[in-house]
């Protein structure tokens, strides 16, 4: 029995010994595993250049720098994306739209002409060079941010003169009128053979042409058709407009002085004429006894007309028959426009009294001098469906020469400053159902005209006078919402005398550096301006057709002054040679 017990005890001791060594082995293996893992982690961290806790302080700064780099990269990429979007979504469709508009204008013109050919009135297809597609009759400079007067005219550029000049000392060329459509331009002026003061006989020069680009890239005006209306008729105060059928012209016919005409009892004879693309001219008398039944004198505004909604629109003015319905409806109506930062010191009641009297100047026998707008349907029949709009004198000043302009989708009426208000005026105009509505005007305080006292260039109070000179502004710079910001024009930079023609860009209060024709003593008169763009080069040009003193051959020579519109912040003046 003792042996059996000893055997059992021995087996137990052996089992315990095995368990002990097994435990020691397991502990050793676990220890080695932990050590190996620690060494591996340390090696890995070392190989990766891991930071110690003390190094972790700079991590937020590094993250911020990395974030800035990423943001900058994304920003530059966004600029590229924005440019791509602007090109693809905005500029390309606009360019296509401009091209489409020009093509549609040409097709419309052709359709009119083909219909005319069917009626034996001849037809042709003049059109500007492709370089000008989308650059005529458009908002040429769209800029919300730049100072308007940072744009300025270059020195006058040499180009082909498309305007005939007098050929004798007694010859006189006066009263230029110009209009340009997407397909062609029209120009006219009056020619008097025996001095500019002769009112009894004259002839009218009328021309149709297109814009071309020379092989060296220069702009020039190419006359395709022209005619001298040298007959027994005495056309005066003519306005011209480029329409799908050619050059439509509105003229009055008179053999008496303006003062005598205003003292007569019947309206002035008026004709609607057209120079077709075939070079033939036709005209038709308007029924002035019906159209101007309340008027004693009526004249076109001299400035160009505009083709809008299948009709041609002209500015007209003249004298109303006292106590006629048209005269009575204007009784007591007036408007006072004020100079920028230079208000009239007179008592308000006195200003109102003078403003009312300004519509009835003594020079024309106390007749009310009224502004109006005439629209005529454009068809192969001349003088078709004429409609006269007489705006209220709560908007317009005393009637005067003027011009209808269309730029983009906006229409304007320029009114010469013949009354007391010297700064240039552009009335926004809307058309509907053959009639026009004028709205409160844009005024350009630095774009003044000379005038006799008390209505000189610096005048600031209402007064009764007939003075000034025709110097129209052309809408040049717009906000993106199509609101007008600035204009180009050639003013006469004098206080009372018609001297010193100077071209500039104007905003509502100031002007850019100017380009002078010559010294301040040079005599000048009417100016009319039109701007356009050579789309191929993205260069904007402005043409000012100006009456400049020409003592050797006639009193005036009509000169087409061409400038390029430049941009910078300088204030120097440019002068033509």
UniProtKB/Swiss-Prot annotation:
Residues 1-26 are intravirion. Pfam families: HN (PF00423). Its main location: virion. InterPro entries: Hemagglutn-neuramid, Hemagglutn/HN, Sialidase_sf. Changing residue 160 to A: About 97% loss of the fusion promotion activities. One of its GO terms (biological process) is virion attachment to host cell. Residues 124-152 are annotated as: Important for interaction with fusion/F protein. Residues 48-577 are virion surface. Changing residue 526 to Q: About 30% to 50% loss of the fusion promotion activities. The keyword tRNA-binding does not apply. Belongs to the paramyxoviruses hemagglutinin-neuraminidase family. Homotetramer; composed of disulfide-linked homodimers. Interacts with F protein trimer. Interacts with host CG-1B; this interaction inhibits viral adsorption and replication rather than internalization. This is Hemagglutinin-neuraminidase. It comes from Newcastle disease virus (strain Chicken/United States/B1/48) (NDV). The lineage of its organism: Viruses, Riboviria, Orthornavirae, Negarnaviricota, Haploviricotina.
